[in-house]
């Protein structure tokens, strides 16, 4: 008796997982396009002591580093540049 609802729930879950997402409304994409370019930030954490090239660049073990489109904010300082998805970002540690 319990197997039928359980089977139906599994079937529904499977169909929902395979279904294509609904297209976004046009007004959502227009407001996104009207706004200024978003600031993309990629957070990178270095925890290995073996990465000597990163330590020479100032990114010591356990230090949190980010790649951002803006200038580095306190307590971070600029150590170079990052390349992510064919865009150049500021590398801050």
Swiss-Prot record:
It is found in: Secreted. It comes from the Eukaryota. GO terms for biological process: antibacterial humoral response; antimicrobial humoral immune response mediated by antimicrobial peptide; cellular response to lipopolysaccharide; defense response to fungus; defense response to Gram-negative bacterium; defense response to Gram-positive bacterium; defense response to virus; disruption of plasma membrane integrity in another organism. Has antibiotic, anti-fungi and antiviral activity. InterPro entries: Alpha-defensin (IPR016327), Alpha-defensin_C (IPR006081), Alpha-defensin_N (IPR002366), Beta/alpha-defensin_C (IPR006080). Residues 20-62 form a propeptide. Residues 1-19 form the signal peptide. Its main location: secreted. Belongs to the alpha-defensin family. Disulfide bonds join 65-93, 67-82, 72-92. Coiled coil: none annotated. One of its GO terms (cellular component) is extracellular matrix. SMART domains: Defensin_propep, DEFSN. Keywords: Antibiotic, Antimicrobial, Antiviral defense, Defensin, Disulfide bond, Fungicide, Secreted, Signal. The keyword Disulfide bond applies. This is Neutrophil cationic peptide 2.
């Amino acid at each position: 008796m319990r197997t039928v609802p359980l089977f139906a729930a599994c079937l529904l879950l499977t169909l929902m997982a395979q279904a294509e997402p609904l297209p976004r409304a046009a007004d959502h994409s227009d407001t996104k396009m009207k706004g200024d370019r978003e600031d993309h930030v990629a957070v990178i954490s270095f925890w290995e002591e073996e990465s000597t090239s990163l330590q020479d660049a100032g990114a010591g073990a356990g230090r949190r580093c980010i790649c951002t489109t803006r200038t580095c904010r306190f307590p971070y300082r600029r150590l170079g540049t990052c390349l992510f998805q064919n865009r150049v970002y500021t590398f801050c540690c």
